[in-house]
Amino acid sequence: MTQLPPPEQTVLKPAPPELASAPLFDHLEELRRRLILSVVFLAVGMVIAFTYRVQLIELVKVPLTYSELYTTGKVQLVTTKLASQLLLSFNLAFWAGLTLALPFIVWQIWAFIAPGLYPQERRWGLPFILGAGFAFAAGVVFGYKLVLPTMVPFLIEFLAGTVTQMQDLQEYIGTVVTFLVAFGVAFELPILAVILTRLGIVNHTMLRQGWRFALIGIMILAAVITPTPDPANMALVAVPLYALYELGVVLSRVFRVIAPEEQERPAPMS
């Protein structure tokens, strides 16, 4: 009788010593402590932001100053509810406070998960966190400095001669904040490409072959974000986004998961 080969056994990597030696209660207590510190940092950031709420509102209103209708008083920002100013101040303080506290909150998250990682994972973890933070900040600055000054005046001046405009302050600021957050997330594209590559979901070959679809999607997104008919403004958004896609392809190749047979392949003789 032919004997069947023994079934393959999955060899699990042992847990890091720091993680294996700590009981569950200690992990929960550590999580509780990190959450409390994160909430404290957020509260401090909100208090600081609320103190400068007037300056923050003026900062968000800067893109309006590029519109002649606003500077000449033909378009005004108004509030339509009694508590709108108070609610708006708290809402703006939350987002600004979260922005101020985010580095400290991310550090608390990293300090909690780092003991459960292997040394090679810890080596790349902190640079990725810093890179993600820098990319998000770059996206926010890019949207605020280059895109909003074009988009906001165009939307305000569209059909300006046929309607009388009184823009709701809360809706305007909500739109600006949402737009800036979206641009910050869009600039995380290279980081996302690396994460998906390390998880084995995509690889650099797939990303390279899909560049046409990515370009079409980016052009459509740029047309939506910048509704002006000027191709230069559309290119202002599309070119950086596609450059980020190409950067993601390069990083996907650099941080690709190397197959075992490729690791064991001997180097060619010189």
Curated annotation (Swiss-Prot):
Residue ranges the record marks as coiled coil: none
Alphabetically ordered keywords of this record: Cell membrane, Membrane, Protein transport, Translocation, Transmembrane, Transmembrane helix, Transport
GO biological process, one term: protein transport by the Tat complex
GO cellular component: TAT protein transport complex
Residue intervals passing through the bilayer: 35-55, 93-113, 124-144, 176-196, 209-229, 231-251
Compartments where found: Cell membrane
Keyword NADP in record: no
InterPro entries: TatC
Keyword Ribosomal protein: no
Topology term for the membrane: Multi-pass membrane protein
Highest taxon, organism lineage: Bacteria
GO molecular function term, any single one: proton motive force dependent protein transmembrane transporter activity
Complex formation: Forms a complex with TatA.
Cited function: Part of the twin-arginine translocation (Tat) system that transports large folded proteins containing a characteristic twin-arginine motif in their signal peptide across membranes.
HAMAP family from the UniProt entry: TatC
Family: Belongs to the TatC family.
Name by which UniProt lists this protein: Sec-independent protein translocase protein TatC
Gene behind this protein: tatC
